[in-house]
Amino acid sequence: MPELPEVELTRRRLERDITGKQVQQVLVRAPKLRLPVPPELEEALKGRTVRAVERRGKYLLLECEAGWLIVHLGMTGFLRLLHTPQLPGKHDHVDIVFTDGSVLRFHDPRKFGTIAWTTDSLDKHPLLAGIGPEPLTAAFSGAYLFRVSRTRRVVVKLLIMNMAIVAGVGNIYANEALFRAGIRPDRAASSLSRTECERLAVTIREVLQESIDLGSTYRVEEGTVTYHPLAFDVYGRGHGTCTSCGGALEAVRLGNRSTVFCPRCQQ
C-alpha cells in the first residue's frame, strides 16, 4: 500500500505536471471503487483549472476552481499522467482529460481506492474530518504523543497507525520507527514514558522524511510497487538478523498486519 512518503512523492509529481491544466472531460469506467465515484464529477470538473495539489495524510487533494478532488490510492492504486492517448487497460478506471491532450489516469486493480468531490471546507469532509496531525509538522510531537497515549488501551504500533492520532503512518514506517526508537510494537501505548514518546516522535519523522528524500520505496512514475528490502531494518525481514545486535528478529501479527521487531533491541 502506498504510504505517506509515496503519496507525498505523487503529490509533488502531480503538482509539477498538472498545476495550471484545464479539464476537458472526465471518463469514469468504474462508477464504484471503495466508494461510488460522484456522478456529478464530470460536470463539476469540466472546464475547470487545477490550481494546486496538496496532501492530507494519505489523501491527495486537487484544488480546482469549483472545489476539491479527493483521491486515496487504496492498496494498489496509482495516478499516471499520459502525454499521448493510450487505450485503457482492464484496471484503468477513471481518466481526467486535459485540454492539452494529456490524461491523468487512475489505475487500481483491487478497487480499494477512493475518488471524492467536495465544494465545502476540507476539514468538514467525512474522509478528512477525523484525521490527526501531520507527522512532519510541529503539531506532532513527543508531548502530544504522550498525552494521547495515556488513555488508549491499544499497543503502541496500532496507536501510531491510527489516522485519528497521526496522519499517514502505515505499516512499513511504523515498523521502522519503532525499531529505531527501541520500543517493542506490542507494548501497551499507555506504558510509554515521556522520554520514549519524544524518541518515537523523532524516529517517525526521520523514517518518513528519509524515505521522501531518497525517493521512497515505491516507483511512482510507473506505479509499480518496488520495495528495497536492504533499506529496511525490520520490515519484511521476519526471522532475519537484526542489523544492530545480530540477533534473530521476530515476526508477529498486530491488528492483522505483519510486524517485525528485535526482542533484544526493542523493549
UniProtKB/Swiss-Prot annotation:
Keywords (A to Z) from UniProt:
DNA damage, DNA repair, DNA-binding, Glycosidase, Hydrolase, Lyase, Metal-binding, Multifunctional enzyme, Zinc, Zinc-finger
Which Gene Ontology molecular-function terms are recorded? 8-oxo-7,8-dihydroguanine DNA N-glycosylase activity; class I DNA-(apurinic or apyrimidinic site) endonuclease activity; damaged DNA binding; zinc ion binding
- Indicate which residues the UniProt annotation says bind DNA: H91, R110, R152
User: Recorded E.C. number(s)?
Assistant: 3.2.2.23, 4.2.99.18
Entry's Gene3D superfamilies? 1.10.8.50, MutM-like, N-terminal (3.20.190.10)
Q: Which cofactor does it need?
A: Zn(2+)
The reaction(s) catalysed by this protein are:
Hydrolysis of DNA containing ring-opened 7-methylguanine residues, releasing 2,6-diamino-4-hydroxy-5-(N-methyl)formamidopyrimidine; 2'-deoxyribonucleotide-(2'-deoxyribose 5'-phosphate)-2'-deoxyribonucleotide-DNA = a 3'-end 2'-deoxyribonucleotide-(2,3-dehydro-2,3-deoxyribose 5'-phosphate)-DNA + a 5'-end 5'-phospho-2'-deoxyribonucleoside-DNA + H(+)
Record-linked SMART domains: Fapy_DNA_glyco, H2TH
Name the InterPro entries for this protein: DNA_glyclase/AP_lyase_DNA-bd, DNA_glyclase_Znf_dom_DNA_BS, Formamido-pyr_DNA_Glyclase, FPG_cat, MutM-like_N-ter, Ribosomal_uS13-like_H2TH, Znf_DNA_glyclase/AP_lyase, Znf_FPG/IleRS
Single GO biological process annotation from the record? base-excision repair
ZnF region ranges: FPG-type: 233-267
Q: Which Pfam families match?
A: Fapy_DNA_glyco, H2TH, zf-FPG_IleRS
What does the cofactor section's free text say about binding?
A: Binds 1 zinc ion per subunit.
- Tell me the active site: P2, E3, K58, R257
- Which PROSITE patterns does the protein's record reference? FPG_CAT (PS51068), ZF_FPG_1 (PS01242), ZF_FPG_2 (PS51066)
Question: What does the record give as the function of this protein?
Answer: Involved in base excision repair of DNA damaged by oxidation or by mutagenic agents. Acts as a DNA glycosylase that recognizes and removes damaged bases. Has a preference for oxidized purines, such as 7,8-dihydro-8-oxoguanine (8-oxoG). Has AP (apurinic/apyrimidinic) lyase activity and introduces nicks in the DNA strand. Cleaves the DNA backbone by beta-delta elimination to generate a single-strand break at the site of the removed base with both 3'- and 5'-phosphates.
What protein family is recorded?
Belongs to the FPG family.
Q: Which PANTHER family match?
A: FORMAMIDOPYRIMIDINE-DNA GLYCOSYLASE
Subunit arrangement?
Answer: Monomer.
Protein name according to UniProt: Formamidopyrimidine-DNA glycosylase
Instruction: Tell me what organism the protein belongs to.
Output: Pelobacter propionicus (strain DSM 2379 / NBRC 103807 / OttBd1)
Q: Which gene encodes it?
A: mutM
